[in-house]
Amino acid sequence: MHFTQQQLQRLMLHYAGKIAKDRKEQKIKLNYNEALAYICYELMELARKNLSVSELMSIGKTLLTSEDVIDGVASMLDEIQIELPFEDGTKLVTIHEPIANDDKIKAGEIFLSSEFIVLNENKTSIEIKVSNKGDRPIQVGSHFHFFEVNRFLSFDREKAYGKRLNIASGTSVRFEPGEEKTVSLIEFGGLKKVLGFNNLCDDFINDENKTKALSKAKEKGFL
């Protein structure tokens, strides 16, 4: 017995659809893959009986309801396309919105809080003036150790030891050439261990290591 790659794929889809059908008959709610396989399985069987494409498109919308699937699945299956063999050749059958979507849950839906989220609440902040003495823009990310930023940014680095920008995680502040602006800084949280960046610290944030970091910053031209 020899099968083409396409025939093997249909056999796999048929097998998956049969499993999904068994679970549906046991009143088990289908997940995304099971729902997709079940509808394709039924369409394959109906095509074998030589129903028309238009008939399959109509029937395809009646095979499952939102009660047959896990919450959120109906909104994920907005379209199904499958190539099926008919007596007069292979045809593409498209089912739009195969499951009536009356879900209480929609995949990817965003639920917004009615209350404002306070950024870095209860964190003590300081403000420092920073100027870009270089000839290129410099961008600093939210969690970059501000003490170790580009040496062309001029500010009181000692005050910035152990601190980062007081901005939302993943955002940044851009300093254009010659620009001066005031930024807000807060202390690092967690273990307060700073590694990497410009390798001025590479240790826990404390007074002893601060002295070492200042010395290294001076050696490397950051002060």
From Swiss-Prot:
GO terms (BP aspect): urea catabolic process
EC code(s) of this entry: 3.5.1.5
CDD domains xrefs: Urease_beta (cd00407), Urease_gamma (cd00390)
Region (Urease gamma): 1-101
Urease beta: annotated segments: 102-223
Molecular functions (GO terms): nickel cation binding; urease activity
Entry keyword set: Cytoplasm, Hydrolase
UniProt enzyme class: hydrolase
Pathway field: Nitrogen metabolism; urea degradation; CO(2) and NH(3) from urea (urease route): step 1/1
Location within or outside the cell: Cytoplasm
Catalytic reactions of this protein: urea + 2 H2O + H(+) = hydrogencarbonate + 2 NH4(+)
Statement: the UniProt record of this protein carries the keyword Cell cycle: no
Cellular component aspect of the GO annotation: urease complex
Complexes and interactors: Heterohexamer of 3 UreA (alpha) and 3 UreB (beta) subunits.
Record family assignment: In the N-terminal section; belongs to the urease gamma subunit family. In the C-terminal section; belongs to the urease beta subunit family.
Protein name: Urease subunit alpha
Organism: Campylobacter lari
Lineage: Bacteria, Pseudomonadati, Campylobacterota, Epsilonproteobacteria, Campylobacterales
Underlying gene: ureA
